[in-house]
Amino acid sequence: MRFTFTRQFLAFFILISNPASILPRSENLTFPTFEPEPYLYSVGRKKLVDAQYRCYDRMQQLPPYEGEGPYCNRTWDGWMCWDDTPAGVLSVQLCPDYFPDFDPTEKVTKYCDESGVWFKHPENNRTWSNYTLCNAFTPEKLQNAYVLYYLAIVGHSMSIITLVVSLGIFVYFRSLGCQRVTLHKNMFLTYILNSMIIIIHLVEVVPNGELVRKDPVSCKILHFFHQYMMACNYFWMLCEGIYLHTLIVVSVFNEAKHLRWYYLLGWGFPLVPTTIHAITRALYFNDNCWISVDTHLLYIIHGPVMVALVVNFFFLLNIVRVLVTKMRETHEAESYMYLKAVKATMILVPLLGIQFVVFPWRPSNKVLGKIYDYFMHSLIHFQGFFVATIYCFCNNEVQTTLKRQWAQFKIQWNQRWGTRPSNRSAAARAAAAAAEAGGDNIPVYICHQEPRNDPPNNQGEEGAEMIVLNIIEKESSA
């Protein structure tokens, strides 16, 4: 499968040959024509030759025109094939995708006049097809590309900052340590590395036309690690889904050795499709810096990723099913029950990446397509920010741990530097609050609400289901 959002980034890649300002100006609305990269240019020429061959073969195979009245003969205009057309009819086709400066979503037209002759341009009196709408670099499209470009930079920058802070919290506070948090830390790390590589690519490779023309090995290595970290990111989402689903159907894993399978799936398996893609890309579609998305070889990576997302989608449905079932058993009000189910679903969606399954295709309508672009790009680039916020900063146990640490810090500060009597009483209250917050107890629900000394494997299936129920309910209320 080819993700629809990757095609949108093609607009960014195209900008590499035009590093100067290309937004519309009142004194100059003429934009330079994109100079294709050598490999992509040869691919486009091959597409053009193949289309011409198919056109002439088609013209020979089609039966003679059987309509009444004058008509325009079937023809090849140098770019596209046109069938026999009745007089007075405007033929319309989608623009070809031979070169990057062609927008295949736009339309090309050719008019057959009333006398049955293809329209001729008045300036040169030659047969003319209208390809003007095929230009991929109109001011509006370029401005939209710039907006998406800076949206990507801002989103991934904010994701890196929040994820680094979240990862630091999980690493520093050992009381938060458990298998589920270990999975969180690994997934956070993939978000951080993936966002860093994307920013490097957008800042150093995309605007540098000279670098892309030279086609150094380093930019292809960067692309390899970008694809690898992207795959790792989605497979660690799958690990999170497997772990949560396991809490429902079997008892909770307690031995650390089980984590090795998650490490193998999250870090090891993505190497397989990424390596295969790199080898086949070098052999069969070796474009400059591997920036083109017009190749089916991307299915090698995106196929397994899509499978992981679909599996997580079914995990989500089953988790919500269990949540609704348990709330029915507790005889909660129906409206409140469904409200909690919706909240739990919204909490799990950014963790499991389900939005890419729910909205897999871009609408063909221009307005809806633009809305889809901004919506999906916001989810993609800010997903790390959302995950860090929901699963760390809004987590009750993390907040309790931070409050306890802050209270202890104030106590130590006051003891070191001395305080007035009123401040001493405040420090005493802070100490009492810190002790009440949990002391040395293991976190309550971030680690499945397991008491430290109780064997987790004795809870059975129902106990495991209630653990997940408590996790989701408390995180959704955070």
Curated annotation (Swiss-Prot):
<keyword id="KW-1133">Transmembrane helix</keyword>
<dbReference type="InterPro" id="IPR036445">
    <property type="entry name" value="GPCR_2_extracell_dom_sf"/>
</dbReference>
<dbReference type="GO" id="GO:0007189">
    <property type="term" value="P:adenylate cyclase-activating G protein-coupled receptor signaling pathway"/>
</dbReference>
<feature type="topological domain" description="Cytoplasmic">
    <location>
        <begin position="243"/>
        <end position="259"/>
    </location>
</feature>
<feature type="transmembrane region" description="Helical; Name=2">
    <location>
        <begin position="182"/>
        <end position="202"/>
    </location>
</feature>
<feature type="transmembrane region" description="Helical; Name=1">
    <location>
        <begin position="147"/>
        <end position="169"/>
    </location>
</feature>
<keyword id="KW-1015">Disulfide bond</keyword>
<keyword id="KW-0732">Signal</keyword>
<dbReference type="InterPro" id="IPR001879">
    <property type="entry name" value="GPCR_2_extracellular_dom"/>
</dbReference>
<dbReference type="GO" id="GO:0030424">
    <property type="term" value="C:axon"/>
</dbReference>
<feature type="topological domain" description="Cytoplasmic">
    <location>
        <begin position="321"/>
        <end position="340"/>
    </location>
</feature>
<feature type="glycosylation site" description="N-linked (GlcNAc...) asparagine">
    <location>
        <position position="73"/>
    </location>
</feature>
<feature type="topological domain" description="Cytoplasmic">
    <location>
        <begin position="395"/>
        <end position="478"/>
    </location>
</feature>
<comment type="subunit">
    <text>Heterodimer of CALCR and RAMP1, RAMP2 or RAMP3; the receptor complexes function as AMYR1, AMYR2 and AMYR3 receptors, respectively, and respond to amylin/IAPP, calcitonin/CT and CGRP1 ligands. Interacts with GPRASP2.</text>
</comment>
<feature type="transmembrane region" description="Helical; Name=6">
    <location>
        <begin position="341"/>
        <end position="359"/>
    </location>
</feature>
<feature type="topological domain" description="Extracellular">
    <location>
        <begin position="23"/>
        <end position="146"/>
    </location>
</feature>
<keyword id="KW-0297">G-protein coupled receptor</keyword>
<protein>
    <recommendedName>
        <fullName>Calcitonin receptor</fullName>
    </recommendedName>
</protein>
<dbReference type="GO" id="GO:0004948">
    <property type="term" value="F:calcitonin receptor activity"/>
</dbReference>
<keyword id="KW-0675">Receptor</keyword>
<dbReference type="Pfam" id="PF02793">
    <property type="entry name" value="HRM"/>
</dbReference>
<dbReference type="GO" id="GO:0005886">
    <property type="term" value="C:plasma membrane"/>
</dbReference>
<dbReference type="Pfam" id="PF00002">
    <property type="entry name" value="7tm_2"/>
</dbReference>
<dbReference type="GO" id="GO:0007204">
    <property type="term" value="P:positive regulation of cytosolic calcium ion concentration"/>
</dbReference>
<feature type="transmembrane region" description="Helical; Name=7">
    <location>
        <begin position="368"/>
        <end position="394"/>
    </location>
</feature>
<feature type="topological domain" description="Cytoplasmic">
    <location>
        <begin position="170"/>
        <end position="181"/>
    </location>
</feature>
<feature type="signal peptide">
    <location>
        <begin position="1"/>
        <end position="22"/>
    </location>
</feature>
<comment type="function">
    <text>G protein-coupled receptor activated by ligand peptides amylin (IAPP), calcitonin (CT/CALCA) and calcitonin gene-related peptide type 1 (CGRP1/CALCA). CALCR interacts with receptor-activity-modifying proteins RAMP1, 2 and 3 to form receptor complexes AMYR1, 2 and 3, respectively. IAPP, CT and CGRP1 activate CALCR and AMYRs with distinct modes of receptor activation resulting in specific phenotypes. Ligand binding causes a conformation change that triggers signaling via guanine nucleotide-binding proteins (G proteins) and modulates the activity of downstream effectors.</text>
</comment>
<feature type="transmembrane region" description="Helical; Name=5">
    <location>
        <begin position="297"/>
        <end position="320"/>
    </location>
</feature>
<feature type="topological domain" description="Extracellular">
    <location>
        <begin position="281"/>
        <end position="296"/>
    </location>
</feature>
<dbReference type="InterPro" id="IPR003287">
    <property type="entry name" value="GPCR_2_calcitonin_rcpt_fam"/>
</dbReference>
<feature type="transmembrane region" description="Helical; Name=3">
    <location>
        <begin position="220"/>
        <end position="242"/>
    </location>
</feature>
<keyword id="KW-0325">Glycoprotein</keyword>
<keyword id="KW-0472">Membrane</keyword>
<keyword id="KW-0812">Transmembrane</keyword>
<feature type="disulfide bond">
    <location>
        <begin position="95"/>
        <end position="134"/>
    </location>
</feature>
<feature type="disulfide bond">
    <location>
        <begin position="72"/>
        <end position="112"/>
    </location>
</feature>
<feature type="topological domain" description="Extracellular">
    <location>
        <begin position="203"/>
        <end position="219"/>
    </location>
</feature>
<dbReference type="InterPro" id="IPR001688">
    <property type="entry name" value="GPCR_2_calcitonin_rcpt"/>
</dbReference>
<keyword id="KW-0807">Transducer</keyword>
<feature type="topological domain" description="Extracellular">
    <location>
        <begin position="360"/>
        <end position="367"/>
    </location>
</feature>
<dbReference type="InterPro" id="IPR000832">
    <property type="entry name" value="GPCR_2_secretin-like"/>
</dbReference>
